[in-house]
Amino acid sequence: MKKLFFFLQFLFHVSLSQEINWSTLYEQENSTSKINFIGTSNSEIFMLSQEGKGLFSSTKKYVLIFDNNTLLFKNKVPIEIENNNQLTYLKCLIINNQLHAFYSKQVQEKSEIYSKILIDQKWGEAKLLCTVPFIESSQINLKYFTTINSLFAFGVRKNELKKINEFCALVLNYNSNSEHIFCAELNSENANLDFTEAQSDTCCNIVLLANYFQKKSFNLNVAIEIPVAIKLTIKNSECKIINLKSLDASNEFSYLINSNQAILLNRENGMPEISFVNFDNDNTSQVLFNSSNSQPTEKEEDYAIEKSSRNTLYEKDFKNLKIKNVFRQKDSSITVVCEQSWKEQICNTLNYRFGGVQCFDYFYSWDVFVFYFSPKGELQNMNRFQKPQVTIDDGGVYNSIVCLQKNNDVLILYNNEPSNLIRKSGKLKTMMYPMSSVLHSIIVNKNGLLNSQRLSNPKEDNAILRPLKTHYINSSEALVLATKNNKFKIGKIKI
């Protein structure tokens, strides 16, 4: 009895220590509102909001500034320069406790990059930072990332002199206003790049992950997709394109751990494979997880068991696996958070006068998998959490998740408990699309579930709020943006 008392006391202490506190900072109902930027400086929180189809198509652009939980400032953002149609939105950054808005203007065959600074809640004059000599700039699809000390702009240009396509990148150091321009030849005149992520180290290396679409010569409508890593070394002015391992010409996810290493999700014969790539060691690849090798292969009739009643995971349980986040722990171990969903048809017997059965095919089974890999790449543990998922009439699916790191644990936020889903005899029933939901959080580590907690009230929200973005304020606080069509809500959570 005494041991039971101490055990319950321990569980109570763990539950309290893992509690998540949510406070709503701001919410707005407008069908065209979007949050483009969230940043923090000291105790102040900066947000850039827009109303309209594009950032420069409407004058209704606002900067919101909070001090802790108090809204200090809301004002329009006058960042237009001459003709709005010539402008491209780059990025907002907080530099030296000031909010900088970067954007570019195309002038003939060049792109001019500007910056406007918010000083004492007033916007200063636009300053021309640099001019990028992109050839035939009208064909360039510029995209932008930020690194530790630099603004990183990149795109594909057509070099008429060499008759080739080139990848080009601009690295602008906004502390010294120095710039570096890199170009590397692409292997095909019809090649294109779909950029996914960029990251830098504290020295002079920048790595960009992209999917390289190379159209086949015999059929220009069919493209081969090749994942590539583009490594820029500022110190030696080098630009190197590295071909990564590609299975079935499909690289569905790439995540940079640092400037030398990445996690990839490929598919082999339709099944997912999670691999680890080292750029500095001859592009070596190490398979971390392969569902066909790690799970028993079962017959179709064996698989058709109600999932909630079985503990064994079969190969089909991983067919639609998608990576949401990757976390590198202090001991160099790796935590990978995935989601898995597939359509199911649920049939209900109706208590109508004429009887009959009605089937709903918009239910999905939605699972969250959390994989834990040792520093050597060995699978240490895997946790699985099941939730219902429903398609809804606003162009998306019901569930959405975002992830944060809490020491060596993972905090997962998602929307849960639709107002008109009823669980009866262990089965889900519904008569219409879900109308509302609550934000929910779980905290997990390699030992399993530590905490499960509701963060909002469906009666107050009266909408399906999907968590979309997160932003760390510090090691113990983060901002969360949740939205559904005509409403967005920004909350601060203590982790």
What residue ranges belong to the model's regions?
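Short, conserved, GDST-rich strand-edge loop motifs in beta-rich repeat architectures
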Residues: Q50-S57, V156-I164, N211-I224, E339-Y362, ...
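Repeated scaffold domains used in trafficking and secretory/extracellular systems
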Residues: N30-F37, N84-C92, F134-Y144, N190-A198, ...
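Bacterial Sec-dependent N-terminal signal peptides
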Residues: M1-S23, I495
